[in-house]
């Protein structure tokens, strides 16, 4: 039955592709008139866009891994020069902005603007996923087009809205989405169109959609938890979540619209960093390896995840410092750091062409709860949540039981012996999202400074990594009338980090 559902999802995507007159997923010629295509055809395409925004080459996960010193470059490749230089100009990772607006958000907006009670579940899903993407865009860029952003057919120059105000509205939109799901559940007058095989995330389980909505709220509340002026607001919103009663995710949220080993149907991470459909290893795979720092850190803390996050060569784990300029002058000599000898991306990250594309890890949800419990509940449940976060990370990677790891007497591993509990939470979250959703650890670093003593690239001309991205060149060209002044990407922090 599972395979049948997956085939239906992929068939929906293929049908849409065959009917498109332009690019992949360009379903509606008029984004403000979504009724031209059925929502059950829009949804899997939109979700596939979400997957690609996270996992494709130069997507959110790539950016996070390079900013957070998880990934480096093998000898023989010149893959990540701009990243190692921290050359965050208007062309740097421009697609992280353009791709989401023109693809994922466009399609989710087609769902969220459907009219009629029969579409209640689809409208709610559209709004939840819009909040998911807008949240990441704010965390990356600060002020962004929001209230007018998805009306570009009639307004090609949308205004930029205040980042904190967007955050507040996103939380409200998520609350409204949960309310709409409940109202649709209880509507005995109109028969609702129920998502099923077309939903590549939860297969139409609307309780899970409510948990996901709460977890996106949780992420945003955690991000603001260092702001004294937002304490009352955070407490109020936590009470709203508790009263609603659905809780948070306890398993990883991932897109799987039927990924398989066929051409153009592989999981986007596997396709970019694993193997092509003929079984040939990709250049990205060979070019990308662990840093020396992260391998040393994992080794020194007796962390068994090392063999799952990174591939272990027959000669043992080996990493490369970011920005190394002359590989042959290292103590290993000529060819000492070629792909066959360094630790590339591991089997817990690259599982198969069929794996789901992770949007939000269960580990992060537990760590976010632990942080808020520490700050707003005197840490009454923080230890249990922290240890659940570590176990969720082990589970995703296939690394087994985590108890022996988190009970060893090591700082930032064992909750009881860690002197700085917040540092322990953020450090463990950094490890848990490594290779999976690493951009979240970059956001955490920008607001907390943890993990401490994280190296910077040897090619960097600044004392620290960027704290945001510059607005893309596409906005400079098309929306210059509303575009704010380009920020200093090293000092102009996002509002929650100030």
What are these regions (language model features)?
Residues 394-403, 407-498:
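C-terminal functional modules
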Residues 37-40, 74-129, 133-396, 418-422:
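Structured, solvent-exposed acidic/aromatic patches
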Residues 1-18:
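Sec-dependent bacterial lipoprotein signal peptides
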Residues 20-72, 78, 99-102, 106, ...:
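Membrane-proximal, proline-rich intrinsically disordered regions
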């Amino acid at each position: 039955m599972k395979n049948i559902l997956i085939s239906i999802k992929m068939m929906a995507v293929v049908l849409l592709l065959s009917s498109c007159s332009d690019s992949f997923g360009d379903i509606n010629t008029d984004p403000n008139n979504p009724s031209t295509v059925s929502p059950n055809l829009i949804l899997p395409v939109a979700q596939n866009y979400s997957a690609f925004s996270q996992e494709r080459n130069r997507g959110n996960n790539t950016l996070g891994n390079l900013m957070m010193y998880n990934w480096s470059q093998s000898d023989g490749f010149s893959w990540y020069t701009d990243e190692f230089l921290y050359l965050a100009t208007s062309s740097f990772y421009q697609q992280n902005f353009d791709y989401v607006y023109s693809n994922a958000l466009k399609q989710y907006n087609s769902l969220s603007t459907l009219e009629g009670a029969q579409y209640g579940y689809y409208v709610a899903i559209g709004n939840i996923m819009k909040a998911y993407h807008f949240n990441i865009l704010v965390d990356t860029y600060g002020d962004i087009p929001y209230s007018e952003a998805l009306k570009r057919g009639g307004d090609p120059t949308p205004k930029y809205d205040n980042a904190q105000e967007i955050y507040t509205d996103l939380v409200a939109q998520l609350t409204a989405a949960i309310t709409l799901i409940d109202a649709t559940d209880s509507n005995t007058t109109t028969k609702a169109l129920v998502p099923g095989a077309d939903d590549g995330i939860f297969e139409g389980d609307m309780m899970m959609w409510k948990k996901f909505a709460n977890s996106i709220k949780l992420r945003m509340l955690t991000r603001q938890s260092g702001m004294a002026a937002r304490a009352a607001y955070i407490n109020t919103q936590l009470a709203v979540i508790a009263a609603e009663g659905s809780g948070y995710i306890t398993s990883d949220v991932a897109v799987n619209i039927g990924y398989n080993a066929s051409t153009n149907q592989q999981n986007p991470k596997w396709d970019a960093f694993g193997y092509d459909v003929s079984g040939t290893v990709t250049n990205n795979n060979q070019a990308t390896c662990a840093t020396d720092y992260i391998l040393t850190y994992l080794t020194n803390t007796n962390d068994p995840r090392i063999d799952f996050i990174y591939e272990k060569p027959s000669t043992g784990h080996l990493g490369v410092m970011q920005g190394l300029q002359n590989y042959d002058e290292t103590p290993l000599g000529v060819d000492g750091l070629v792909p066959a000898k360094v630790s590339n991306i591991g089997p817990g990250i690259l599982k198969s062409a069929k794996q789901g594309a992770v949007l939000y890890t269960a580990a992060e949800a537990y760590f976010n709860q632990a942080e808020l419990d520490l700050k707003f509940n005197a840490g009454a449940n923080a230890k249990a949540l922290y240890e659940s976060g570590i176990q969720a990370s082990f589970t995703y990677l296939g690394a087994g039981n985590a108890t022996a790891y988190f009970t060893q007497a090591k700082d930032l591993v064992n909750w009881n012996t860690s002197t700085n509990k917040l540092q322990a939470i953020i450090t463990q979250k950094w490890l848990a999202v490594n290779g999976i959703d690493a951009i979240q650890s970059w956001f955490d670093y920008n607001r907390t400074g943890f993990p401490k003593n994280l190296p910077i690239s040897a090619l960097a001309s600044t004392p620290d990594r960027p704290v945001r991205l510059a607005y893309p060149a596409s906005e400079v060209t098309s929306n210059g009338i509303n575009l704010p002044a380009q920020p200093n990407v090293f000092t102009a922090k996002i509002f929650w980090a100030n």
